[in-house]
Amino acid sequence: MSEEELGKLNEKMEAIIGLSKAPSQNIVFFSLLGTGKTMTVGEISSEVGLTSKATERAVAKLLEKELIQRAPFRARSYSCDSKEILLGLLVTVQNLKERLDKRGL
């Protein structure tokens, strides 16, 4: 994996950590990640109990952060790449372990 790819993964992991400060984005992200489904804004709204407008704003922000993607095969639908998120988490854990090892912890 290139340094650029690692950098992008680290940025995404930081963005995920930052979702705790954005409750609507947090709930939409984890709903898409947890279900593994491709969903429309209306479906996401029903799933998580947010208004359509709040869901639209959350989806727009998550797209901007590249934490979710537009589904290529279903109009106005979104999904979350769980494999990419898992890879990012593994890289983050590996980095954390290396830092702890350097400190002798």
Where does each model-flagged region fall?
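Amphipathic alpha-helical dimerization/coiled-coil segments
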Residues: 2, 87-105
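Short, Lys/Arg-enriched N-terminal segment that forms or immediately precedes the first helix
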Residues: 2-18
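Short, cationic-aromatic polyanion-contact patches
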Residues: 15-25, 40, 73-95
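Pre-recognition alpha-helix immediately N-terminal to the DNA-recognition helix
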Residues: 26-31
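Short helix-capping/hinge SLiMs at alpha-helix to coil transitions
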Residues: 32-36
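A short acidic, leucine-rich amphipathic alpha-helix
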Residues: 43-46
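Short amphipathic alpha-helical interaction segments
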Residues: 49-64
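A short, conserved structural fragment
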Residues: 63-73
